[in-house]
């Protein structure tokens, strides 16, 4: 925690400096590698961690070493993780998917924007200084065409996006040869179907079945394809966004880059302050990961924050605005029905979802059904035209342990299952949002209810938090629940930062939340038995047992913190090769003692073996050569 709090001006200046000096940067002793698919432009980025050799014998003057294999790991940082790529935030990222989109010939450029609000913003000269300069001309599906990955999958088509994902999900484990690294405990998948090798056809089939989604708006060609589904790696989402009282465009772009560096698979822009439209454009043009939003937040801004004044027309205009900017998935609170609102009256904490409370207030003030529910088919038509995935929001999620798994929560969940089937009629991809605050013994029911009533559509949860007593540490309380529900089958975990319930997270909070959730996701992958998930753990354990400190730091999710903690007590360079750490010291290190025991046992075995052979030699008459029948 910083000792001195920066002023708003200093925070913006710091963010601007970050953007101005931004370069592609690799983690310590790592390098960016690319694995090429069936065509030259399918190049999957990964990070490869270089390891030092193991000392296996010899003397001081003639040491003998054994090489250790480099470890490939999944990398969400896009061009920001490649030192050979020139970064220019003003120009945005390269349009990786544009050739694939154009080759399908099922979309066309629009001659004008569909959103009245977008036209207004573009006509306002006063916004020129804030506006991203390299605006794309948006695309839309041609008449009679559908451009969603679900549509292609149902047609039996394997898209370049699907091939990219298959290679990415295998995490380069085919490069690993050592048996020690490849060993893995069998997992317990609770019905998940995890193939030994993920193929493009498997990706296609999972998407076609609705069990996985590929958030990939045709107007976000900068994004690197990824998949969300329980038969794949558990993913992590990071939330960013400005508010009416804090943050700027510069700071949000900085948070985006920072999020992808620390492992965010997707990022949600939850901006509610000024310049939402302009901020989102900067984020999208510079994002290598899918971007999600909650459109009702911006629609509310358009009616001056008065929920009762919301209209379907204002919301529809917002959907078109965001779809044509390139938003990859919308959170839509269409399951908050008028008849469910009274179910929350006896709750300890009522309705805690912002989107849920907005729609509940609208329903009660008009005594009408939720207009998102009433117009859901029109929402699907818009999403199908741009390939925007739907994240069906849990507006009635529990906001406290006491309210977990109640009538309102599950009534809404069942409605989300009905809406899922409607979205699938339009070939729109769907995932389901989940809680919230749930004690450990009640978590699994959330997963089983979702799988049954939402037809195995991917589940995406906020935690859940397993206790309510730890403000300031809710990344821990929720990380516990996240690991559990990820194991049970949840496809994506929405991170929680230390600032949850307390304030808007800053850059360091974003990192803390992401590291916590990457741990939870990885723990779930291990428990499910995702092929290759244990390779990095094995490499770390081997480095730890062999006192390869530099390799331990570099294999860590956060190499910088691992190194800093070690150096607090053993800062000298000699500490990086010492066969002990400061916890036990040189005489009581369990691993050092284990090595000595192993060496001693090996020596004893050799001695006993030689003695046995000597006795055998004498028993056979002491002859150098024996007749065949005596051997």
From Swiss-Prot:
**Could you say which protein family the record assigns here?**
Belongs to the ThiC family.
Entry note: cofactor: Binds 1 [4Fe-4S] cluster per subunit. The cluster is coordinated with 3 cysteines and an exchangeable S-adenosyl-L-methionine.
> Mind telling me what this protein is named?
Phosphomethylpyrimidine synthase
Q: So what EC number does this one have?
A: 4.1.99.17
What NCBIfam families does its record include?
A: PRK09284.1, PRK13352.1, thiC
Question: Where on this chain does substrate bind?
Answer: 239, 268, 297, 333, 353-355, 394-397, 433, 460
GO term, biological process aspect, one: thiamine diphosphate biosynthetic process
Q: Looking at its record, which EC class is this enzyme?
A: lyase
Q: Which UniProt keywords apply?
A: 4Fe-4S, Iron, Iron-sulfur, Lyase, Metal-binding, S-adenosyl-L-methionine, Thiamine biosynthesis, Zinc
User: What is the role of the protein in this entry?
Assistant: Catalyzes the synthesis of the hydroxymethylpyrimidine phosphate (HMP-P) moiety of thiamine from aminoimidazole ribotide (AIR) in a radical S-adenosyl-L-methionine (SAM)-dependent reaction.
Q: Which GO terms describe its cellular component?
A: cytosol
Q: Which GO terms describe its molecular function?
A: 4 iron, 4 sulfur cluster binding; carbon-carbon lyase activity; zinc ion binding
This enzyme catalyses:
5-amino-1-(5-phospho-beta-D-ribosyl)imidazole + S-adenosyl-L-methionine = 4-amino-2-methyl-5-(phosphooxymethyl)pyrimidine + CO + 5'-deoxyadenosine + formate + L-methionine + 3 H(+)
Task: State the superkingdom.
Answer: Bacteria
Protein source organism = Citrobacter koseri (strain ATCC BAA-895 / CDC 4225-83 / SGSC4696)
């Amino acid at each position: 925690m910083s000792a001195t709090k920066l002023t708003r001006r200093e925070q913006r200046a710091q963010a601007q400096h970050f953007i101005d000096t931004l370069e592609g940067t690799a983690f310590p002793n790592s390098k960016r590698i690319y694995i090429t698919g069936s065509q030259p432009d399918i190049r999957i980025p990964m990070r490869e961690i270089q390891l030092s050799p193991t000392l296996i014998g010899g003397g001081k003057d003639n040491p003998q070493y054994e090489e250790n294999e480099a470890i490939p790991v999944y990398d969400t940082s896009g061009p920001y993780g490649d030192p050979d790529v020139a970064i220019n935030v003003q120009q945005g990222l390269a349009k990786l998917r544009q050739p694939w989109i154009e080759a399908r010939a099922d979309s066309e450029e629009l001659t004008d924007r569909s959103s009245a609000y977008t036209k207004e913003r573009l006509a306002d000269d006063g916004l020129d200084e804030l506006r991203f300069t390299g605006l794309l001309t948006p695309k839309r599906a041609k008449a009679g065409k559908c451009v969603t990955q679900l549509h292609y999958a149902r047609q039996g088509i394997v898209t370049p996006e699907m091939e990219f994902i298959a290679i990415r999900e295998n995490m380069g484990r085919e490069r690993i040869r050592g048996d020690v690294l490849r060993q893995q405990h069998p997992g317990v998948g609770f019905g998940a179907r995890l193939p030994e090798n993920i193929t493009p056809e498997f990706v296609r089939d999972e998407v076609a079945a609705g069990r996985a989604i590929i958030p990939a708006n045709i107007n976000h060609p900068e994004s690197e394809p990824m998949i969300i589904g329980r038969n794949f790696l558990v993913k992590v989402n990071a939330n960013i966004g400005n508010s009416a009282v804090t943050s700027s465009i510069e700071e949000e772009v900085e948070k985006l880059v920072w999020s992808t560096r620390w492992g965010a698979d997707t990022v949600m822009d939850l901006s509610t302050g000024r310049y939402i439209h302009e901020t989102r454009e900067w984020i999208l043009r510079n994002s290598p990961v899918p971007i999600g939003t909650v459109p009702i937040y911006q629609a509310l801004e358009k009616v001056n924050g008065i929920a009762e004044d919301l209209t379907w027309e204002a919301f529809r205009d917002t959907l078109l605005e965001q779809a044509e900017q390139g938003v990859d998935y919308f959170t839509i609170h269409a399951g908050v029905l008028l008849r469910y609102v009274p179910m929350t009256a006896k709750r300890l904490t009522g309705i805690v979802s912002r989107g849920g409370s907005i729609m509940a207030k609208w329903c009660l003030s008009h005594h009408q059904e939720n207009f998102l529910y009433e117009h859901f088919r029109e929402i699907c038509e818009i999403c199908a035209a741009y390939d925007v995935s739907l994240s069906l929001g849990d507006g009635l999620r529990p906001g406290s342990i006491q309210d977990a798994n109640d009538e309102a929560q599950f009534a809404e969940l069942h409605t989300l299952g009905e809406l899922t089937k409607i979205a699938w009629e339009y070939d729109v991809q769907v995932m389901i949002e989940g809680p919230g605050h749930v004690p450990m013994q009640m978590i699994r029911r959330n997963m089983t209810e979702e799988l049954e009533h939402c037809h195995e559509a991917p589940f995406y949860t906020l935690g859940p938090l397993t206790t309510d007593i730890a403000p300031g540490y809710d990344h821990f309380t929720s990380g516990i629940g996240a690991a559990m529900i990820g194991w049970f089958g949840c496809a994506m975990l929405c991170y929680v930062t230390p600032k949850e319930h307390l304030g808007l997270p800053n850059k360091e909070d974003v990192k803390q939340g992401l590291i916590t959730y990457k741990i939870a996701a990885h723990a779930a992958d291990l428990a499910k038995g995702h092929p290759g998930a244990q390779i990095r753990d094995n490499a770390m354990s081997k480095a730890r047992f062999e006192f390869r400190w530099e390799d331990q730091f570099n294999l860590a999710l956060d190499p910088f913190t691992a190194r800093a903690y070690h150096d607090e007590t053993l800062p000298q360079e000699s500490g990086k090769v010492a066969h002990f750490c400061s916890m036990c010291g040189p005489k009581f290190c369990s691993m050092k003692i284990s090595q000595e025991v192993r060496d001693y046992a090996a020596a004893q075995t050799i001695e006993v073996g030689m003695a046995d052979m000597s006795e055998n030699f004498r028993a056979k008459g002491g002859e150098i050569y024996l007749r065949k029948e005596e051997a």
